[in-house]
């Protein structure tokens, strides 16, 4: 069963509203994790064993694979982009993006992986999010998340 695009897109403004307000952090994480769990139930997400399968299963959770293309697989990492226009785009609110992407981190937990946003649409001039996925048991210490990089004042990914 496909998640209807209209339903998926209706969730985005609610997610942005919560994630844009740091004082709502107590509610944002459970909300995003709950929405991800609901998506996983509707789409019948299954744990995967290889990093390629993890990337493909993450893609399958969206209304269209075209909006979340896998751009490459290197060693233990799947790279992908998120082409859905984010309301955080260009705002500089990379922390809000991080809170909102709890949705994807929860999905990756359920399918056996980890999720890191490398570049966020919230950063000035960035039009697509660049993300990385690895199996749950593979360290991600070498991947610098966008919100950490932005906090350091470095807007160029490593």
Regions found by a protein language model. Give the residues of each.
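N-terminal accessory segment detector
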Residues: 1-79, 83-103, 114-158
């Amino acid at each position: 069963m496909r998640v209807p695009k209209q339903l998926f897109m209706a969730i985005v403004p609610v997610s942005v509203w919560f994630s844009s307000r740091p004082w709502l952090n107590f509610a944002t994480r459970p909300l995003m994790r709950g929405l991800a769990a609901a998506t996983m139930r509707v789409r019948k997400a299954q744990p995967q064993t290889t990093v390629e399968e993890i990337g493909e299963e993450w893609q399958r959770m969206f209304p269209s694979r075209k909006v979340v293309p896998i751009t490459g697989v290197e060693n233990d990492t799947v790279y992908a982009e998120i082409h859905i226009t984010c309301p955080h785009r260009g705002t500089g609110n990379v922390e809000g993006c991080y809170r909102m992407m709890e949705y994807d981190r929860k999905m990756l937990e359920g399918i056996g992986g980890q999720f890191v946003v490398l570049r966020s649409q919230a950063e000035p001039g960035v039009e697509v999010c660049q993300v990385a996925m690895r199996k749950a048991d593979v360290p991600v210490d070498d991947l610098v998340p966008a919100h950490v990089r932005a906090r350091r004042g470095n807007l160029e990914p490593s």
